[in-house]
């Protein structure tokens, strides 16, 4: 399927890439709003590959339990290489990426970072692995810069390493951030983009002073109504080879809003189902899930951590918070006690935009379920 829209976000990110690296950029938004799709579109179709070489690290591909898993995600091991001197290998890899054919350049687009097996094995035999990892990446990126190519480092779902610790209980995440600050603001060696659907993680990063003045944030949200209706037109032509009437498009939007993945689901099902049946089932499904979630609160006492405190929640307070959305899709985060919204965000019922201080349901579908049930 052809890529649709997002020109505003694409132009912003391309403008950032054209400048000197100075910040770590966090790309955030609600679940399935299209963050990864956007970055892959930029990497594959919008970059000038004569100037840039992107490395795409997807933490969803592995179960990240420790530093070893983190390192395995960062690199693609060159099993054929017998080079154990990382400097020698980095020079040859930089030459390949800069002087190689267009086919080679396209092959490496958006892959993890290549590393020789002997050096990779050597890293795993050390107690402090992160130092060698960072040293290799820094050296490779410096060589690419010398040869006129700017690396772009992309981390997808970075929050998955949040709880991993290094030796001495130091957080891997903050060790990585220090390294990324060195690569961007200090040495200007590469651009860094961190993608996350976990809005509590974005809040955690945003309010922590260690990245003050070193990070910026880009929201990739669900489509607004006008764009959503155009997306419906686009999909109807691509999938159904026809145009939907205005009332049907309005009906689709009223149920699922501008969530791209849900709009795609509706249009695809229209190949073999009636529109009203599709939408009624989707809303019934979302309502049932919300009902079961609330019913469980009659038997459990959920607890959340806020700072060093563990706070027990009451069902009536959770229901009261959800009822605030009966008349508004968005509310200020100050209207809901933090322990309550933390719990509802963790359960993927609400989305928090910490930069704007806004809470809203993860989707129109959940919003409609709230209004129907409460």
UniProtKB/Swiss-Prot annotation:
Chain ranges passing through the membrane: none
SUPFAM superfamilies, alphabetized: P-loop containing nucleoside triphosphate hydrolases
Pfam families: ATPase_2, MJ1010-like_2nd
Keywords, comma-separated and alphabetical: ATP-binding, Nucleotide-binding
Residues holding ATP: 29-36
One annotated GO molecular function: ATP binding
Keyword ATP-binding recorded: yes
InterPro entries xrefs: Archaeal_ATPase_domain, ATPase_dom, MJ1010-like_2nd, P-loop_NTPase, WH-like_DNA-bd_sf
NADP is among the record's keywords: no
Homology family: Belongs to the archaeal ATPase family.
Name recorded for this polypeptide: Uncharacterized ATP-binding protein MJ1609
Source organism: Methanocaldococcus jannaschii (strain ATCC 43067 / DSM 2661 / JAL-1 / JCM 10045 / NBRC 100440) (Methanococcus jannaschii)
Taxon lineage: Archaea, Methanobacteriati, Methanobacteriota, Methanomada group, Methanococci
């Amino acid at each position: 399927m052809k890529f649709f829209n997002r020109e505003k976000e694409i132009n912003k990110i391309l403008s950032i890439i054209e400048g000197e690296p100075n910040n770590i950029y966090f790309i955030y938004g609600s679940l399935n709003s299209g963050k990864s799709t956007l970055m892959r579109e930029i990497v594959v179709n919008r970059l000038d590959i004569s100037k840039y070489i992107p490395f795409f690290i997807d933490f969803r591909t592995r179960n990240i339990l420790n530093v070893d898993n983190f390192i395995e995600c960062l690199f693609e091991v060159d099993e054929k290489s017998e080079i154990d001197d990382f400097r020698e290998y980095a020079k040859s890899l930089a030459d390949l990426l800069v002087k190689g054919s267009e086919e080679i350049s396209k092959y490496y687009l958006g892959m993890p970072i290549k590393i020789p097996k002997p050096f990779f094995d050597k890293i795993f035999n050390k107690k402090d692995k992160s130092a060698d990892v960072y040293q290799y990446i820094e050296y490779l990126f410096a060589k690419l810069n010398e040869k006129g190519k700017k690396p772009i480092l992309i981390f997808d779902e970075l929050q998955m390493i949040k709880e991993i610790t290094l030796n001495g209980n130091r957080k891997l995440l903050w060790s990585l951030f220090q390294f990324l600050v060195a690569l961007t603001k200090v040495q200007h060696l590469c651009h860094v983009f961190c993608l996350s659907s976990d809005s509590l993680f974005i809040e955690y990063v945003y309010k922590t002073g260690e990245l003050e003045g070193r990070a910026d944030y880009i929201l990739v949200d669900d489509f607004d109504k006008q764009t959503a209706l155009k997306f419906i037109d686009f999909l109807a032509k691509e999938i159904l080879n026809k145009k939907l009437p205005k009332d049907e498009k309005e009906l689709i939007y009223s149920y699922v809003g501008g969530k791209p993945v849900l709009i795609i689901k509706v249009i695809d099902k229209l190949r073999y189902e009636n529109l009203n049946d599709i939408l009624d089932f989707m809303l019934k499904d979302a309502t049932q899930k919300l009902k079961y979630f609330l019913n469980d609160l009659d038997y459990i006492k959920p607890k959340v951590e806020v700072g060093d405190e563990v706070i027990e929640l009451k069902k009536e307070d959770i229901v009261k918070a959800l009822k605030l959305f009966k008349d508004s899709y968005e509310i200020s985060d100050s209207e809901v006690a933090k322990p309550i919204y933390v719990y509802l965000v963790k359960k993927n019922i609400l989305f928090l935009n910490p930069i704007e201080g806004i809470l809203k349901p993860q989707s129109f579908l959940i919003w409609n379920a709230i209004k129907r049930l409460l």
